Design a protein with these regions (language model features):
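Conserved phosphate/ATP/ADP-binding segment of small-molecule kinases
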Residues: 146-234
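Acidic, metal-coordinating catalytic segment for phosphate/diphosphate chemistry
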Residues: 349-393
Length: 531
């Protein structure tokens, strides 16, 4: 069951106009009156999408019967706390000429402390049977601005994930309760943090700083420019769906419903949100020495499917939002709309996050977007895995990968057997096992990768007209188990083909500065000592 909380329900009266004149008279072409509130609208969308939902919140003495009638008509389950006062009314002015929405929102009637405490108890009573909780929207006078933080702390005792859709103090305080996902729009995000953003990179970096505080996902909706979803390892971007916009107000609530639906479908399948093959491996200290301790006996999960789940989250959210945009007023998406738009939703990588290191490999404690690391020349970690064997006549040979022709940099060049960056939170060893599996399909067992040495390099170049300063501290490994090239599974985005090359021949090739090889002579000289 997906719980939604609406502490400030309302009557939304939407006026559709053309060329709205502030301070003047503007004819109204259509009016639409709906009872709603952010959490209630999320429940309405979830009901349309076929997901189980229970609506929780306040019900006012005046207007409360209409609120219940609306939920009954939609066959939405609810458990509401009755309070004195009148259901507030909000005025929405949708201008068809420029697709903008102006809002006049009433703050609502004051709520007593006793009613707040009863409401908290009522909400918490449903936690034991819930799979997900949505806290959304404003709160009326009398409700403390840390109410969402309070509910988040209580949800933690039930291991109940929470989506928080709020702004201002409600969002800032709520972040301290570590929700599973937050969803401010760009204006709310900017106002809440007290910062102006001049690029997508700045938005992503600010969101990643919030992720570092223990929040798995931050979604920043960009209105007509699409949406960003930022997690621990990477950031994703989805452009706004190409639809005829008839209403804006229900899109944000439908977006949240899309996140809920993606979560619900994974929950039904019994899938972990980052479920992948695990390997055990030996930890290395920064000098490269084996550090055999209890930590080295733990399993390190390769979170290869976490990005896949992130993409599902964003695709579902954008498809649900698209379905709402085609409807007037505050109407939310229908299942038929969701199914129609889901195949059209595009999601692309907007960035990866690296731990910033010192030249000696020690962490600075800062996490930055990959593009900013390369812009600022920050030291970061990489792993180089050389696959080696010997021919029947005893000659040593190394496996070379030919980089994909679709790569942005050095397409078609010959490169290390397998290599990759350390994502934020990675250690060298787990990154090495992961990259070897992702790029070549080699599932190494504990101890199969032999650490050899660290190598540092600093290169300044220009890429797409931008100065790039690449400062890497790479851990170099050897993999010497038998390898059947016909059974490798190459990562298409990274590798076109692989082939063996004699070590002596490779050394000769690297004497030629024009050779299309991304391999350093110094590294090969170092590897020779271990072969």
């Amino acid at each position: 069951m997906i719980l939604t909380v609406t502490l400030n329900p309302c009557i939304d009266r939407t006026l559709t106009v053309s060329n709205f004149r502030e301070g003047g008279t503007t004819p109204v072409s259509a009016t639409r009156t709906e009872i709603g509130g952010k959490g209630l609208n999320v429940s309405r969308a979830l009901k349309n999408l076929g997901a189980p939902t229970l609506c929780l919140g306040f019900s006012h003495e005046k207007g409360g019967s209409d609120l219940k009638a609306t939920l009954d008509e939609a066959a939405i389950l609810y458990d509401l706390e009755a309070i004195p006062g009148e259901l507030r009314m909000n005025i929405k002015i949708f201008d068809e000429s420029n697709r903008t929405m102006s809002e006049l929102n009433d703050k609502g009637c004051r709520v007593s402390e006793e009613a707040v405490n009863r409401m908290i108890a009522r909400i918490v009573s449903h936690f034991k049977d819930a799979e997900l909780l949505v806290l959304a929207g404003s709160v009326p006078p009398g409700v403390p601005t840390d109410i969402y933080k309070t509910l988040l702390k209580k949800a933690q005792t039930f291991d109940l994930p929470v989506i928080l859709d709020a702004s201002g103090a409600l969002l800032l305080n709520g972040i301290e309760g570590r929700p599973w996902l937050i969803k401010p729009n760009i204006d709310e995000f900017s106002a809440t943090l007290g910062r102006e953003f001049h690029s997508r990179e700045e938005i992503i970096q600010a969101a990643r700083e919030i992720v570092a505080r223990g929040i798995p996902y931050v979604c920043v909706s960009l209105g007509p420019d699409g949406a960003l979803l930022i997690g621990e390892k990477e950031a994703l971007y989805s452009p706004a769906p190409d639809v005829e916009v008839r209403g804006l107000q229900g899109a944000g609530d439908s977006l949240v419903a899309g996140f809920c639906l993606a979560f619900h479908e994974h929950h039904l399948k019994g899938e972990k949100l980052s479920e992948t093959p695990a390997v055990q491996n030996t930890k290395l200290d920064e000098s490269g020495c084996s550090a055999e301790n209890s930590e080295s006996e733990k399993k390190t999960e390769l979170k290869a499917d976490a990005p896949t789940f992130m993409r599902s989250l964003l695709r579902y959210a954008q498809a649900a939002a698209a379905g709402s945009l085609t409807k007037p007023g505050t109407a939310v998406c229908e299942r038929v709309d969701f199914d129609k738009y889901l195949p059209t939703i595009q999601v692309e990588k907007a960035g990866e996050f690296f731990d910033v290191r010192r030249e000696d490999g020690n962490l600075t404690g800062e996490v930055k977007l990959r593009s900013l690391v390369h812009r600022d020349g920050d030291w970061h970690g990489t792993v180089h895995m050389w696959v080696a064997d010997r021919t029947p006549d005893g000659k040593c040979r190394l496996l070379i990968q030919k980089r994909s022709q679709d790569k942005d940099n050095f397409p078609g060049y010959c490169d290390i057997s397998s290599a990759g960056h350390l994502d934020a939170g990675d250690d060298y060893d787990s990154a090495a096992y992961r990259e070897l599996y992702e790029e070549l399909g080699i599932r190494a067992e504990k101890g199969d990768l032999r650490f050899c040495f660290f190598i540092t390099r600093s290169v300044e170049t220009e890429f797409h007209g931008q100065k790039v300063i690449d400062r890497e501290r790479a851990a170099v490994y050897l993999y010497e188990k038998p390898v059947d090239l016909t059974k490798l599974h190459l990562q298409k985005e990274e590798v076109d083909e692989v082939f063996w090359i004699d070590l002596e021949e490779l050394e000769k090739i690297l004497q030629d500065p024009t050779a299309k090889y991304c391999v350093y002579k110094e590294e090969i000289q170092g590897i020779k000592k271990y072969l």
